[in-house]
Design a protein with these regions (language model features):
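General detector of folded, globular domains
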Residues: 10-12, 43, 47-48, 55-58
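A short, Lys/Arg-enriched interface patch at domain edges and termini
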Residues: 52-72
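Major-groove DNA-recognition helix of helix-turn-helix-type DNA-binding domains
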Residues: 21-48
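Intrinsically disordered, low-complexity regions enriched in Ser/Pro/Gly/Gln/His and often acidic
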Residues: 5-6, 46, 50, 62-63
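N-terminal cationic amphipathic segment used for targeting or macromolecule association
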Residues: 17, 38, 44, 60-63
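Polyanion-binding surface elements
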Residues: 2-31, 60
């Protein structure tokens, strides 16, 4: 909450927050960033990830999903 009683919504996530959202470890998220699968920006010594970039990654992974044997 800020001084006006309004909840602040983060405009970006940290690597730890993205790892928690996706159920991954932080090292896996960093590897996704290094590999270019997940976009990020450098903020000092940290990396920041916009929520829409997380959505892009999830959509990309969903489009690569193989059909399951029972849906064929």
């Amino acid at each position: 909450m800020n001084g006006n009683g309004l909840a602040l919504v983060p405009k970006w996530y940290t690597v730890a927050q993205v790892a928690s959202l996706l159920g991954y470890g932080e090292s896996r998220v960093r590897m996704l960033i290094i590999g270019g699968d997940l976009r990020s920006l450098k903020d000092g010594r940290s990396r920041r990830i916009l929520p829409e970039w997380v959505d892009e990654y999830v959509q990309m992974r969903a489009s690569q999903a193989e059909p399951t044997w029972w849906s064929q």
